[in-house]
Amino acid sequence: FIKVSSDHGVDIYRIFDSMNWMENMKLPVEEALKTGKIVEGAICYTGDILNPKELKYTIDYYCKKARQLEKMGCHVIALKDMSSLLKPYAAKKLIEALKEEVRVPIHLHTHDTTGNGIATYLMAAEAGVDIVDCAIGSMSSLTSQPSMNALVEALRGTKRDTGIDPDGLLVLNDYYEHERKIYKPFE
């Protein structure tokens, strides 16, 4: 799959195991590296690193996984918060720790199910995150990604200003607002 998809234009491989079992990620990482494309090793976030009673899913746990992925040769480390569990202050603390542990870029992926998405991204930006995933405003929130429109505005005029034209985003927002209505029954 990796070779064929690479031959047909896939440029970035986000490789993860839902249980963060590094042994299960070795072969796909090795194969993706052979393609010469970007290999992003992802760590699935769960638990609550701010909870003093949390014994397994700690900052040390995530840092160890990140070091293992970097050692495998991953070009980027993704923190994949598929359940919107990562709280804003936890994001700041964890991204700071990951930036200290590895030398490759850190990519944060979250969903906005809890409504914390933008706050989480702002704290991650303060901590130095390199990449985040967003959705255009009219397609964002709920189980989608946080709003790109909101993030661009929140960061405007700061050291993390995206440089993205908000007026251009409004054009896209209006287009997709119409499209979203088609899929409303499936939300």
Per-segment meaning from a language model:
Residues F1-E187:
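Catalytic cores and adjacent flexible loops of soluble metabolic enzymes
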